[in-house]
Amino acid sequence: MNNQKKYHLFDVLIYAILLALAFLFQSTSILFKYNSPAPSLVLALVLIISFYENYWFSAIFGLISGILLDIISVNGVGFHALTYMLTGIICSSVMKRYLQNNFASFAVISIPVVIIHQFAEILYSSGFDLGIITLFLKYYLIVAIYTFASAFVLYIIFRYTLKRSERFVKPKGIINKK
């Protein structure tokens, strides 16, 4: 096995551990009170991964992440899997074609994606009820703001960790294909 494949397998292992931690913190009340708005950490992780990987990997990661959420979700099967997969594909494609990987680009992409995802979630779970705007403003907008904040913090940590690992761990001549 060559060095490039070893490092990609190591990245996949790190992503799996991060997904397990994000899923654990999101689905339990370890950090947040029960039935209070909490950030969608898995969505934040899908956004971050889509900034660093190609669109196929981002789509598969989004699909697996969504399937995990659909298993415990009351909204029905398939919603999170489909939306997270599309999030991975679209964000990664836009990132690779039109933007540079920096904090401003992350903000430009993640803010509309999180708002659209939260609005789609409320439409899927509640239908087209008249109280949908009130519910969005009272609960889902707070979730979106928490998700923005957690995504930005995770992005900064991820970017710093990635720079340090490339500088100290990977031998010279190894280039990540993205």
Predicted regions, residues:
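Terminal, non-globular segments
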Residues: 1-178
